[in-house]
Design a protein with these regions (language model features):
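Conserved PLP-binding active-site segment in aminotransferase class I/II-type PLP enzymes
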Residues: 163-248
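Conserved C-terminal alpha-helix-loop-beta "cap" of PLP-dependent enzymes
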Residues: 478-572
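Hydrophobic/aromatic residues positioned on beta-strands within the core alpha/beta folds
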Residues: 138-140
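Short acidic/histidine-rich motifs immediately flanking catalytic phosphotransfer sites
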Residues: 55-62, 342-348
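Conserved acidic segment of CheY-like receiver
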Residues: 4-25, 29, 39-42, 49, ...
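Conserved PLP-enzyme active-site core in the AAT-like
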Residues: 43-46, 247, 277-493
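Conserved N-terminal alpha-helix of the aminotransferase class I/II PLP-enzyme fold
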Residues: 229-274
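Conserved phosphotransfer microenvironments
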Residues: 36, 46-47, 56-131, 142-147
């Protein structure tokens, strides 16, 4: 299994499209990259190109020939695949659709949709709305080069069209280099290389690469169970080349910079003792004794502890609980606005962006109002670390909303080890030096390097295949919902069900993460303990959470289709 660099080429002149792809394709062997599969995909229309971008997660680069003819309808039809946050329609798309329907007759709408767009920068914008991580390389005429670059945002590089045909190696070289940069793992690569060298250890940890376990008649089974690599890769801060977690130097610093680039923030930091510690680091950085902080009463206990440690004064938002199903919703937007306006001297507002059950706050409203009053916004997004990487989820992302501080439990729903966490900072007033002092207070001087490496490769996966995996998961969830709709006594709860549970669900534009599958089991003639015992003991399924009337199933980046089939088979 190799990484796949699939290059989408967009040109509506068929002969020219074939000429461009043939020229680039014939140079692939020049680069001697047996470690990467390189292929090309042709699109002779914008509609087809955008369909490929939506459906083919292996696309890693786009070559766009400027002057392609595109119609308005090809761009307005760009909607998130499986956008199931609010009954298959995002709030923004639904609002625009309704407004257009009121303002135009059918004939006027048809004419407008078939109109040719006057600026191909809109095509690039459409690509970026679906896959913002995709680099777009523009081909154009020499005389238009500067005009094109001035018109369009999101261009990775520009090439004269004739030069590409005569010298295709230049653009392919650029594409491969950019692919390698995105795919880079600064810490994991350095770490792995050091371990493979098998240096003779005369430093901590005391087991010396597992020798104390391996040579013992009493505890050698511990070594055999985990295997050699776990022990030889258990290193110490004595290895200077790997850098320091508290200082963010060398390979660790480079890996953290890569995370910040992927998540589109100013700074990112690795934390190896969970988002509980990440939350406390942020709170102690921002709050002083007596400072007001507006907080969700139902937030994680680490937020309460952090407020206590800082000796700050909490102003609590009321919890909203549904006793029938045993789940909490986000606080009411009306109360959030009220407390912000009544406490304009507050230093910070802290909210849980995504609840345990997947209910999502419309954070853009919160951020905009808080920033109007000079209040910083900190979002605990522990359960929604993948939110940026698919358009069906992005509207509810804390980073996309403009929050100042965000924490992600990278071990909960993406591919890092337990206790691995990200801190993201977007605050223009960030006091980096003071943050580092607080970070050092809460951070071990002997961090587990495997956790740091897992955060590095977690970023790599989200950057390179996050969209592809999420797209497949969302498609699988939609199919599971369709199949389970046939059941008489089991039901996957949907946004309409949440709207019935919480009176503010629709008015507050609350969303739901479809990868948190909440199943209503109240119609079954079994207790939740009996259901739990059956799923665990009889079919070997360990479920995330039970209430008296629901079970919560998490689909994460490891949620293969076969797991979904096993779940369906157990419930059927």
């Amino acid at each position: 299994m190799r990484p796949h660099l699939k290059i989408l080429v967009i040109e509506d002149a068929v002969d020219l499209l074939e000429q461009i792809t043939s020229s680039i394709g014939n140079t692939i062997t020049y680069f001697d990259r047996s470690d990467v599969e390189i292929s090309l995909l042709e699109a002779n229309s914008v509609a087809k190109a955008l369909q490929f971008v939506r459906e083919d997660g292996d696309i890693q680069a786009v070559v766009f020939s400027w002057d392609v003819v595109a119609k308005v309808k090809e761009l307005t039809d760009v909607v998130p695949l499986n956008g199931v946050l609010n009954e298959n329609t995002s709030p923004a798309a639904e609002s625009v659709s309704s407004q257009n329907a009121n303002e135009k007759t059918t004939g006027e709408k048809s004419s407008a949709r078939n109109a040719v767009i006057d600026n191909n920068a809109r095509v690039i914008d459409a690509i970026k709305r679906i896959r913002p991580e995709l680099p777009v390389y523009v081909l154009g005429d020499a005389v238009k080069g500067l005009d094109i670059v001035n018109q369009a945002n999101g261009i990775e590089s520009f090439f004269y069209r004739n030069d590409i045909i005569s010298d295709p190696e230049s653009i392919l070289g650029y594409i491969i280099n950019d692919f390698d940069d995105r795919n880079e793992t600064p810490f994991w690569t350095e770490y792995k290389d050091y371990v493979v060298e098998s240096n003779d250890s005369w430093h901590t940890p005391g087991h010396s690469g597992g020798a104390s376990f391996r040579n013992s008649p009493y505890i050698s089974d511990f070594y055999r169970f985990f295997g050699r690599n776990v022990f030889v890769s258990d290193l110490s801060v004595s290895v200077d080349s790997l850098g320091s977690l508290s200082d963010g130097t060398h390979a660790i610093g480079k890996a953290q910079a890569a995370v910040a680039n992927t998540f589109e923030v100013r700074h990112s930091y690795f934390v190896t003792n969970g988002s509980s510690t990440s939350n406390k680091i942020i709170l102690q950085t921002l709050l002083r004794e007596g400072d007001k902080v507006i907080a969700d009463r139902n937030c994680h206990k680490s937020v309460h502890y952090g407020i206590i440690q800082a000796r700050a004064m909490p102003v609590y938002l009321d919890s909203v609980f549904n006793p029938e199903y045993g789940i909490f919703s986000p606080p009411r937007m009306a109360q959030i606005k009220q407390l912000i306006e009544e406490n304009t001297d507050a230093k910070l507002i802290v909210l849980t962006g995504c609840t345990y059950d997947g209910l999502l706050t419309d954070l853009k409203q919160v951020v905009n109002l808080a920033h109007e009053h000079g209040i910083k916004v900190f979002i605990d997004e522990a359960w929604f670390a993948y939110s940026l990487f698919h358009p069906a989820l992005r509207d509810y992302s804390a980073i996309a909303a403009g929050a100042d501080y965000i924490t992600h439990s990278a071990h909960k729903v993406v591919s890092a080890f337990s206790q691995a966490s990200f801190i993201h900072v977007n605050d223009p007033d960030f006091d980096k030096d003071f943050f580092k002092e607080v970070f050092a207070i809460h951070t071990s001087t002997s961090p587990k390097y495997q956790l740091i490496a897992s955060l590095d490769v977690c970023r790599q996966q989200l950057e390179m295949e996050g969209y592809k995996i999420l797209n497949e998961l969302l498609s699988n969830v939609a199919e599971l919902k369709s199949q389970m709709a046939k059941f008489k006594r089991l039901k996957i709860l949907s946004p309409s069900d949440f709207a019935n549970m919480f009176s503010h669900f629709e008015s507050d534009n609350i969303g739901h993460d479809p990868l948190k599958i909440l199943i209503d089991v109240s119609a079954l003639d079994y207790s939740n303990q009996e259901i739990h015992r059956f799923l665990m003991d009889e079919v070997g399924l360990e479920i995330e959470k039970f209430t008296h009337s629901t079970i919560l199933v998490l689909l994460t980046l490891g949620g293969m289709r076969s797991k979904i089939v096993r779940l369906y088979n157990a419930l059927k």
